[in-house]
Amino acid sequence: MRGQKLAPGDYHLIVHACLFNDAGRLLIQQRQTTKKGWPGLWDVSAGGSALHGETSAQAAAREGREELGLSLDLSGVRPAFTLHFAAGFDDVYILRQNVQVEDLTLQPEEVAAVRFATLAEVQALLQSGRFVPYPKTLLPLYFETAGF
């Protein structure tokens, strides 16, 4: 349950979906200023916590649907990366999907804005403190894995 301390041997599963278009741009979202973690900062396309009993693919598809109104078919898709942190794991899905920003339905409690960005634009946001503070080598790896 959210906010409860994990029992010994239990881990938290986080998921992220990184959507790239054919032009090599990553769909990024700006977190609402009311969010507890990293308010107002830009982040990758969609992400959040898996619910009890969900697979990471189910959680990533749900987050895409909830936050952006996107239908993501992740059946049979494995995460490109599983990142480890002290309390758990973060499964990262790298996806290629051409979507139009104006066709997205943003979840107002979570997402303030979305746009597509190049790696250089994402790195500039990161360097200026306006992007969730991922390790500086991580986002270039996402672009490279997507083929850009």
Range-by-range predicted roles:
Residues 2-3, 39-40, 81-148:
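Nudix hydrolase/Nudix homology domain
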Residues 14-46:
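A glycine-rich, hydrophobic loop/mini-helix early in the fold
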Residues 18-20, 71, 83:
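Short, conserved, surface-exposed binding loops centered on an aromatic residue
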Residues 28, 45-78:
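The catalytic Nudix box helix
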